[in-house]
Structure formats: C-alpha cells, structure tokens
Amino acid sequence: LQEAQAQRHRIIATDGVFSMDGNVAPMDKICELAEKYDALVMVDESHSAGVVGPTGHGVAEQYNVYGRVDIFTGTLGKAFGGAMGGFTTGKKEIIDMLRQRSRPYLFSNSVAPAIVGASLEMFKMLKESDALHTKLMNNVSYFREKMLAAGFDIKPTQSAICAVMLYDAKLSQDFAAKMQEEGIYVTGFYYPCLLYTSPSP
C-alpha cells in the first residue's frame, strides 16, 4: 500500500473466511489499513455469508464494518442452497461501472431463474430468523467436540470450516476416499494447496 500511493486506485482484496483452515479475516484491521492508505476494500464472502457473524451475515457483520467495505462477492453454491452462480454487490457507483466494464458480467450467461428464486428465498430466510445459523453453529460445535474427544487434531476457528489435520498426504487421500465410501463427502487437501507439512481432508 505504501508503494502504491502514486497509483490512481488501491484495493485490498481478501477472503472473509479462508477455505483451507477456516481462519476469519480481521476486517476491522483491514478497514483501518484501507482508510489509512485511501484504498478500497473488497471481501469475498463465499465461505462466510450465511455462516459467520451473530446472525450469519458474514464478516462485515462480525466486525461491524458494513459501511467500510466497498465491494462484496460471494457464491450461491454454499450456504445459499448449494446451487451455482454468484454475486457482486457494493457501492452503487462501483456496481454501475462494473455493469459496463466487467467482461465476466458482460459476456456470460445469466443464472437460471429457479436458482435466483431459491437463493433470494434463502437470503430472506436468513434475514427473518437466525434459527438456521444457530443450528449450523450448534452442529459445528458438536462435530468439533466429538472429533477432539476421538483424538483428532482440529484447528480452532470462528467459522464452520473444521480442518481435520492428518499431516500426511497419502493418509489424507485414503481418509477422504473412505469417508466418501460411507456416504460422507470429504475432500483431502495437501501440498500444493496447503503447506507441505499440513495435509488434511
């Protein structure tokens, strides 16, 4: 940011929740940096919308920085029903510009109406009640408690991502395959997705 001061625009882009370990971005500190260096803030809420925050409205809610974030992106394929597609929203002047200049927006197909309808209904449900969010976080706590009691190493997190650390790429792959045989969808991650020392499903 210091080196970019001569540039016309500066932007800090971050995930709200980092998918490999469930760490939550410190949005209060990021927004302070942006204000100090006159930069825009863009946050990808793909793993945080519907999950993080007192009512599941994402990291902007968690850190109370709604008016300090300029651009939000997210997916409709996770907390909002597991469908497809995504969204970009934010300050009006930025969105108006993106509607004219964003090649992925201009040259792609629209999301199917049924997916739009289901996603809008999910947004409405989350806005009207925190019951789904509360149930999710209770399930996460239960899962973590039982896995830790069974002797597994799970990284602490404020999100719903529970990284089970196995520290061996082959074991990670075998573990994930066995879980899928049992009807439980698990993905094993290992180098280069993770540091060489920390493969996990």
Model-derived features: positions:
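A short beta-alpha structural unit
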Residues: 19, 120-124, 159-167
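Active-site PLP attachment segment
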Residues: 55, 61-97
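Conserved PLP-binding catalytic core of the aspartate aminotransferase-like
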Residues: 134-182
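Conserved small/polar residues in nucleotide/adenosyl-binding loops
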Residues: 196-201
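Catalytic P-loop NTPase motifs of RecA-like helicase/translocase cores
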Residues: 20, 49-50
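PLP-dependent aminotransferase class I/II
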Residues: 80-147, 152-155
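Active-site phosphate-binding strand-loop segment of PLP-dependent enzymes
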Residues: 1-43
